[in-house]
Amino acid sequence: SRGFRVLNWNSYKGSNKIWQEDLERLSSLSDLVVLQEGYLTDNLQDLLNKKQYNWDIAKAFAYNDIYAGVLTASRIKPDFLCSFRAPEPLSGIPKTVLITRYPLSGTDEYLVIANIHMINFSLDPSDYRAQLKKTAEVISQHRGPLIITGDFNSWNTERMKILADIIQELGAQEVVFDTDHRATFMGQQVDHIFYRKLVPLEALTEKVRTSDHNPMLVTFRLADDA
């Protein structure tokens, strides 16, 4: 198959005109648009509707009647979705997870996408582990092709170890980028894309000025044994 392209971006509640131009350009090449800190302005809704995306948002909070959270948009409609929140111990503003499932045309397979924004300001690793484990419990019902993507706030080795263990349990592996401009915090990369029963054909990152995170663009095809 020709494959499909996934854009993942923590867009930092993007709302200005240049940010919108970035998103318009990046999304025009993408079958799936996965945002963290998506800020559901009228402009963003117009852009998604104009491009005929089906989209869902797991709301973290509302500010001035505008919802913010993780948002997943796709060319095809999901046949299942599940979302939940994990409270930030210090700020009180929750982080959200959105899990969607898509029937893959021409096959009897389904693709599951987990769009994750992990909690940040918690020194207790059990909070971090609990949010990932809850996500993994939902995903573990699905045996087929899988993408786990987002801002994992994996800024220390303890968090990276928790993340790596759960990803391994799910039989997934991490995308390696040809050019790697992913955001780092305290020396660790925080944005990741993991996959299972798929083959990455191209994996790029792009430097932008409109967010403190750089977008990740990956083209996948189904693995032969999917």
Predicted region positions:
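N-terminal, active-site-proximal structural segment of metallo-dependent hydrolase catalytic domains
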Residues: 1-50, 62-67, 133, 223-226
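Loop/turn elements at helix/coil->beta-strand transitions in domains of secreted/extracellular proteins
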Residues: 2-4, 29-31, 52-53, 108-111, ...
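Active-site-proximal beta-strand elements of phosphoester/diester hydrolases
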Residues: 3-13, 82, 109-120
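Active-site metal-binding loops of divalent metal-dependent hydrolases
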Residues: 11, 38, 116-118, 150-152, ...
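Structured beta-strand-rich core segments of catalytic domains in phosphoester-bond hydrolases
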Residues: 32, 36-110, 206-207
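Active-site neighborhood of phospho(di)ester-bond hydrolases with catalytic His/Asp-centered motifs
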Residues: 33-37, 56-59, 147-151, 174-179
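His/acidic metal-ligating clusters that form di-metal
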Residues: 99, 103-105, 110-112, 126-149, ...
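Metal-dependent phosphoester-hydrolase catalytic domains
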Residues: 101, 140-143, 152-226
